[in-house]
Amino acid sequence: VIKKILFLLFAAFLVSRTIELLQLSSSIRPEKLSWGASLAFAFMLNLFVTGIFAFPGFVFPTGQLLPHAYYRVRHPQILNTVYQVLAVHYFRKALLLGFWGKAKNRKRFFNGTKAGIQQFNYQTRQSEFGHAAALVLIFALSFVVWAQGHLLAFAFIHLINFIGNFYPVVLQRKHRAAIQRLLPADSSRALPNQN
């Protein structure tokens, strides 16, 4: 219970920091925001907004907020093309070199057992929801920054959002396309109880 409360407080803190960041940018004239400051601003906005969805997703089944049909991969060939064209496999390799390279961290997603496939399915949904929600909100907030005249920050926001949130969505959908081949159609609805 304490962990859930703390993580919700972290998310609320990030909401307030996001609002403060946007208020700060509105008080700065576009020509005063340097290249480096624009990049830092874009990075912080992406980090804060992604965290708003990540922290609750660590302690609540946020993936269930979207309907089951959303998570079904209906056109795996198109997904494979997007995966290849965007070179998402390099993004995956970068993740494996970092945090997910440790066996302990990988086992959180999939432990190699048959029951682990259901857990993996659940984790892909959790991850995809967090990144997809952040992707959409950051996209919307970027137009506030654009309206303030911070065009360089606007461009950096989209670049970071694309790599930091769109790539993970594609990666999780790629994982789920493989899961769908392993699980009967209805079994992917029976997700582990995560509280």
Regions found by a protein language model. Give the residues of each.
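Juxtamembrane interface helix immediately N-terminal to a transmembrane segment
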Residues: 1-8, 120-122
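Membrane-proximal soluble regions of multi-pass membrane proteins
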Residues: 62-120, 178-181, 185-195
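Hydrophobic transmembrane alpha-helices
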Residues: 130-179
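Long, highly hydrophobic alpha-helical transmembrane signal-anchor segments
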Residues: 4-75, 130-132, 139-143, 148
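Short, amphipathic, aromatic/basic-enriched membrane-interface segments that mark the entry/exit
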Residues: 120-131
